[in-house]
Amino acid sequence: VITSNSRNENGEVVFGMNDAAGVFPAWPGTMGIAAAVKGNGPGLVDTFAECIRREWDAVGLKKGYMYMADAMTDPRWQRTYGTFGEDPALITEMISRLVPGIQGSESGVTPEGVAVTIKHFPGGGARENGFDPHYEQGQWNVYQTEGSLGDYHLPAFKAAVEKKASSIMPYYAKPAAEKS
């Protein structure tokens, strides 16, 4: 199985990284897609998902590490660009449409579909001081507001499970209710 991170939001060819596959048609980044959906309605997500599925299937990419279901609750986090923003209802709508659209069916992955990995469970956008969890000072996801984990961060992951996403990627940070 050939896998990749999403390719439709990055038209830059990087030698040794994505040059062999060529450039895929460019769409706006994930925040741009979310903004367009907010302004034009969710049908755009269906078109986006169908384009991804067809393009990836045509070149033999059958597994995508995409998309981030993280609610951006700390704007200092350097990965905010990969989120659909901070609105849990919009993020949930995006994931609910992307998963079956890319995989090819409401029932899971079809032969023409591309298996998706939704990331970063249980919600990587709650970064302590915006620090990156690849380093010791960024090891915590802090859900300080009572109920924020369930209200803001988990709904899109629940939708991913309901829509039969092929997998969910856990985050490499530790969940906490208080700052370290």
Spans of model-derived segments:
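Glycoside hydrolase catalytic-domain context in secreted enzymes
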Residues: 1-180
